[in-house]
Design a protein with these regions (language model features):
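Secondary-structure capping and boundary motifs in well-ordered enzyme cores
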Residues: 33, 37, 64-72, 87, ...
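Short helix-capping/linker segments at secondary-structure and domain boundaries
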Residues: 83-90, 239-241, 340-344, 363-376
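Short acidic (Asp/Glu) and glycine-rich catalytic loops that position anionic groups and cofactors
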Residues: 19-24, 52-56, 117-119, 208-210, ...
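Basic, low-complexity intrinsically disordered segments
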Residues: 11-22, 26, 38-148, 163
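Short, hydrophobic/amphipathic alpha-helical patches that form generic packing surfaces
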Residues: 75-82, 357-367
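Helix-centered, glycine/charged polyanion-binding patches within enzymatic domains
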Residues: 175-180, 185-196, 277-350
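Polybasic low-complexity intrinsically disordered regions
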Residues: 93-96, 106-290, 298-300, 363
Length: 376
């Protein structure tokens, strides 16, 4: 090898040079893979948001300082549910450096990110117009989504959503102070430990100072009582998509009364409605029949007589409904783990319900592209 060839030869190892490029000539859209799941989801979201333009316009004054566009607010909140972002502060941090997040929300690479407090203030405006529910309906009414929904077979269920309040905040309504506690070092403190043993606490006499809408409730015998709200879902049985979501006070009859309200609003005469053993009561079965629906609830015949008999259970459709009904646990599981609703981050039933409905819509948006791809 001659000396000239040796000097001109370049080493295989690349150099770890850090150089800042002032300008970038690649659009954000080119950074996102063509088969990324968020591409289909964004198309669905944009189509649904376009139908809400008039509803958005009613929430804002004609004159004034421009605020965060409501479309971008909702897209950002959907990302918070999709990727389990714990707080709005963390969401703004991710929007600052995550190009995928910027692309989905509609920000360019150079657009400034909003302050977390400003974001929350603008978000709360959407609560006044019940935008979360309107957005869910808009998604379900999209032509490509409507064809996926069953109009005759449904399932209902409820779950507890733990409130953002500790048991120490559950104090007597009459203002009497609870017995003083002691801290770890034996002295009292602002957040001193409490011994609740032997103390009778009921919703009639006590309420939470942190979230007065929360109720002390346990889902079943032997379960832990906690401050919570009760969330309700109605699912269509063809593809397991959520068609209604509501949040109410946690009590022993809320599941059945709310289910009847959802049936009346969404199910036509001749429909079937599946439910677990908690719905096998005379009042719920009678309520379904009054609305022209057949109750396909699981029989609860332990030390009691079931509210339905062989006239219902002998049909093949009953067995199918009891199998399909179990799928309603899937959205509840996703909403609590991925969607972050195992313990809500918000206070007040109105705001908690708003996020409950939006998270249910986020679950639908995760499922719809997969169903569309499977059905062709």
């Amino acid at each position: 090898m001659c000396m000239r060839t040796f000097l001109l030869r370049k080493p295989m190892r690349g150099k770890d040079d850090r150089s800042e490029i002032l300008f970038s000539y690649i659009r954000l859209d080119e950074r996102i893979p063509a088969d990324h799941p968020l591409r289909v989801i964004r198309q669905l979201v944009d189509a649904a948001l376009a139908e809400l333009s008039r509803a958005f316009a009613k929430l804002y004054a004609r004159d004034g300082r421009p605020s965060i566009p409501p479309e971008r607010l909702l897209r950002a909140l959907l990302l918070q549910a999709f990727y389990t972002v714990r707080s709005e502060l963390q969401l703004m941090e991710q929007l600052n450096y995550n190009l995928l997040f910027r692309w989905f929300v509609g920000l360019s690479a150079d657009d400034p990110v909003w302050d977390a407090t400003v974001f929350c203030k603008n978000r709360d405006r959407l609560l006044n117009g019940d935008i979360a529910r309107k957005f869910m309906i808009s998604v379900l009414n999209l032509p490509e989504v409507r064809q996926l929904l069953s109009s005759e077979h449904f399932s209902v269920d409820g779950t507890l959503i733990e409130a953002w309040a500790s048991m120490k905040s559950f104090v007597p309504k009459d203002g009497s102070k609870p017995p003083p506690g002691k801290g770890q070092d034996g002295s009292g403190g602002r957040n001193a430990e409490r011994d609740f043993h032997g103390e009778k606490r009921k919703n009639d006499t006590h309420s939470s100072t942190t979230d007065p809408d929360a109720r002390l409730f346990r889902k079943g015998a032997g379960k832990e009582a906690k401050l919570c709200h009760m969330g309700h879902l109605m699912m269509e049985n063809r593809n397991g998509l959520i068609i209604d979501a509501r949040l109410t006070e946690a009590n022993g009859t809320a599941e059945r009364t709310t289910a009847l309200d959802m049936i009346e609003d969404n199910a036509k005469s001749g429909s079937t409605v599946g439910g677990d053993k908690n719905y096998d009561t005379a009042d719920f079965v009678a309520g379904c029949r009054e609305r022209g629906c057949t109750p396909h609830v699981s029989q609860n015949d332990t030390n009691r007589r079931s509210a339905i008999d062989a006239r219902t259970t002998r049909h093949p459709g009953y067995r199918i409904s009891t199998i399909k009904r179990k799928r309603i646990e899937e959205p509840f599981g996703w909403m609590k783990t991925v969607g972050g609703l195992r313990k809500t981050r918000h206070r007040g039933r109105g705001l908690v319900e708003w996020f409950f409905v939006l998270t249910a819509t986020a679950y639908n948006l995760i499922r719809i592209p997969k169903i569309l791809a499977a059905t062709g």
